[in-house]
Amino acid sequence: MADFLGMMKQAAQLQSKMQEMQDALGNVEVEGISGGGLVVVRMTAKMDVKGVKIDPSLMKAEEREVLEDLLVTALGDARRKAEAAVQEKMQSLTGGLGLPPGLFGQ
């Protein structure tokens, strides 16, 4: 019975910490970069895009396809970095709770 109560207490702690982490992820920002910095996308770890910077040299009509490709690449780079930030936060959150490895994608 004591084990069950301990597990319930851990579950409540985890739920509280998960909510704190979700709130904190909105403040974690990453940058996705492509074309050696010609395109930079800023987003939060919650995947909200906060800004896009485009080098003026890409603003020509003949560079449209290059710009489109660089935007896709920069967004993908930012998404990967945001996912890594989430993983890092999740590992720090669940590390001391004695949960089985891989339970939350660790």
UniProtKB/Swiss-Prot annotation:
It comes from the Bacteria. Keywords: Cytoplasm, DNA-binding. The keyword DNA-binding applies. One of its GO terms (cellular component) is bacterial nucleoid. It holds the Pfam family YbaB_DNA_bd. PANTHER family: NUCLEOID-ASSOCIATED PROTEIN YBAB (PTHR33449:SF1). This is Nucleoid-associated protein bll8115. The keyword DNA-binding applies. SUPFAM superfamilies: YbaB-like. Disulfide bonds: none annotated.
